[in-house]
Curated annotation (Swiss-Prot):
Inducers of expression: The 56 kDa isoform is constitutively expressed. The 54 kDa isoform increases 9-fold during 10 hours of high light stress and decreases after 24 hours of photoinhibitory treatment.
Biological processes annotated in GO: ATP biosynthetic process; proton transmembrane transport
Class of the enzyme per the UniProt entry, highest EC level: translocase
Subcellular location: Plastid, Chloroplast thylakoid membrane
Major subcellular site: plastid
Miscellaneous remark of the record: Two isoforms of 54 and 56 kDa with the same peptide fingerprint are found in the chloroplast. The synthesis of the major 56 kDa isoform is coupled to the assembly into the thylakoid membrane, while the 54 kDa isoform accumulates in response to various light stress conditions.
Keywords: ATP synthesis, ATP-binding, CF(1), Chloroplast, Hydrogen ion transport, Ion transport, Membrane, Nucleotide-binding, Plastid, Thylakoid, Translocase, Transport
Record GO terms (molecular function): ATP binding
Name this polypeptide is given: ATP synthase subunit beta, chloroplastic
Highest rank taxon of the organism: Eukaryota
């Protein structure tokens, strides 16, 4: 999941949120 969080940092907020919700980890979005 750490790799996902780092990967999300390169994505726009919208994509980041969708990936976070799809993965079911809201905390990863808040961490970013």
């Amino acid at each position: 999941k750490d790799a996902l969080v780092y990967g999300q940092m390169n994505e726009p907020p919208g994509a980041r949120m969708r990936v976070g919700l799809k993965d079911g980890s809201i905390t990863s979005i808040q961490a970013v």
